[in-house]
């Protein structure tokens, strides 16, 4: 098998057929009929699965992996990659915001640059002002707290060599962030500037984005724990200096401490920090708890061919 095209389905019913047609044309132009298209149904609540199954009645190059429930975009993608068999794998979203026709230009760049992965980045992030700002903050905070040099505005679409895919799926985290794994897997990678179309509403609201950021950071770095330690050290030192100041004022300047307002404010402030730091440690402990259970990160209900 020369090429595998991997995509996920979630509220994708209006795109499934057109995606298959366009992806098939792109694959045929590149490798003839030696390709497969893998759909991973991530517990989609609409008729995405039914439409994909209908395609299998007419075409024999389709594999559908039906997950038992919604496990999340990243885990669904990894499941699809694990079932791919092509010498090259083209991973892409099925909502047609990312064009299947990019396969050709990605392949040209991969050949020209002799790389193991070519992936797309947007020159301008789509969406409203708030979405653009929160997106930029996500990448900045992620790089700051993990040390992983993830470029801004990456997209799902990417063409990968078989050895790169094998290395990628060797990661066995249960709480995974595939965006970081793409980078730390290594090999020679190159980017291509692309422009996504706006054909659908995003399924990521602010709460999901915040949860994604926390998961991404705590999956790739212990720096938040290091920063917690140094923050505590700094606050302890500051409190010690403040106590010395109060003692000097009391014994040598006959000036008693001021009222309770500043004391209450300080108690609230430090109590908040304590709760925050305990929460950070709790997140890491919960991840360790989940990983030690060694549960599969997805469960497959059925595979259609």
For each of these PLM feature ranges, what is it?
Residues 1, 8, 67-69, 158, ...:
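Short conserved micro-motifs on helix faces and helix-strand junctions that flank
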Residues 61, 73, 88, 102-105, ...:
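Residue-level recognition of specific faces of alpha-helices
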Residues 57, 82, 108, 135, ...:
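Solvent-exposed polar/charged
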Residues 14, 177-305:
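Hydrophobic helical membrane-anchoring modules
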């Amino acid at each position: 098998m020369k090429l595998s095209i991997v995509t996920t389905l979630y509220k994708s019913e209006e795109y499934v057929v057109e995606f298959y047609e366009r992806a098939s044309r792109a694959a045929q132009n590149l490798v003839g009929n030696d390709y497969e298209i893998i759909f991973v149904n991530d517990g989609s609540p609409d008729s995405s699965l039914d439409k994909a199954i209908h395609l299998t009645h007419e075409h024999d190059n389709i594999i559908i992996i039906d997950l038992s429930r919604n496990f999340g975009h990243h885990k669904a993608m990894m499941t699809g990659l694990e079932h791919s068999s092509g010498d090259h794998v083209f991973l892409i979203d099925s909502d047609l915001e990312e064009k299947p026709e990019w396969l050709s230009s990605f392949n040209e760049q991969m050949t020209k640059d002799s790389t193991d992965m070519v992936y797309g980045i947007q020159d301008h992030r789509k969406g409203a002002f708030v979405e653009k700002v929160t997106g930029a903050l996500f990448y900045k905070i992620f790089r700051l707290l993990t040390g992983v040099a993830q470029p801004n505005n990456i997209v799902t679409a990417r063409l990968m060599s078989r050895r790169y895919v094998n290395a990628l799926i060797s990661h066995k985290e249960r709480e995974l962030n595939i965006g970081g794994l793409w980078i730390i897997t290594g090999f020679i990678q190159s980017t291509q500037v692309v422009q996504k179309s706006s054909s659908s509403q995003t399924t990521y609201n602010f709460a999901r984005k915040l949860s994604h950021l926390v998961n991404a950071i705590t999956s790739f770095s212990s720096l938040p724990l290091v920063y917690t330690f140094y923050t505590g050290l700094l606050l302890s030192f500051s409190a010690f200096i403040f106590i010395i100041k109060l003692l000097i004022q009391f014994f040598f300047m006959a000036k008693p401490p001021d009222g309770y307002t500043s004391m209450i404010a300080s108690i609230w402030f430090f109590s908040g920090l304590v709760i925050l730091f305990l929460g950070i440690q709790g997140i890491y402990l919960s991840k360790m708890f989940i990983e030690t259970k060694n549960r599969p990160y997805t469960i497959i209900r059925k595979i259609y061919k």
